[in-house]
């Protein structure tokens, strides 16, 4: 679980804010059918219950942060204790290299935690995310899994 109050500054535009219950802001991200397909390969949107269960799991099994871009919360990023990374950025803020910068910061966090390897599960149709992870040095390890040795 992230240390409350331990905001991680990524750069002058982005900071990672430790998870706190904020359904009003986060639920709309997960009610975009395209985002749900990219992230979970599902054809339905999240309910409040599903959202809260996801965040509870991520926050108790690793570090979970909201992504603040120029003072606006635009998504979330997590690093599970198992080394699995996940990131979601709402559609309006995609294609601004926010994800790339956040994943770099999460790689730093993984190193701080002494992790030797991180992974990401990225669906084959999500070429945007696959390309971003590959550009950061991740390699396909089979199926829809990618890994980076730290």
Task: Identify what each model region corresponds to.
Residues 1-48, 52-56:
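A short, well-structured alpha-helix characteristic of acyl/acetyltransferase catalytic modules
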Residues 1-10, 139-150:
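Acyl-donor-binding surface of acyltransferase catalytic domains
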Residues 100, 124-142:
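Conserved active-site alpha-helix within GNAT-family acetyltransferase domains
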Residues 93, 97-105:
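Conserved acetyl-CoA pyrophosphate-binding loop and the N-cap/start of the following alpha-helix
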Residues 41-92, 149:
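Acetyl-CoA-dependent GNAT
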Residues 110-123:
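Conserved GNAT acetyl-CoA-binding A-motif
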Residues 19, 89, 122:
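Hydrophobic adenine-recognition pocket in adenosine-nucleotide-binding enzymes
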């Amino acid at each position: 679980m992230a240390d409350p109050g331990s905001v991680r500054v990524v750069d002058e535009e982005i900071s990672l804010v430790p998870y706190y219950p904020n359904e009003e802001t986060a639920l709309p991200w997960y009610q975009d059918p395209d985002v749900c397909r990219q992230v979970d390969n599902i054809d339905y949107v999240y309910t409040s219950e599903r959202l809260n269960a996801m965040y509870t799991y991520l926050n108790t099994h690793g570090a979970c942060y909201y992504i603040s871009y120029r003072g606006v919360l635009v998504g979330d990023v997590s690093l599970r204790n198992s080394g699995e990374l996940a990131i979601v950025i709402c559609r309006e803020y995609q294609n601004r290299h926010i994800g790339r910068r956040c994943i770099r910061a999460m790689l730093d966090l993984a190193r701080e935690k002494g992790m030797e390897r991180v992974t990401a599960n990225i669906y084959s149709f999500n070429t945007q995310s696959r390309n971003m992870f590959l550009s950061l040095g991740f390699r396909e390890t089979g199926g829809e899994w990618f890994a980076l040795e730290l």
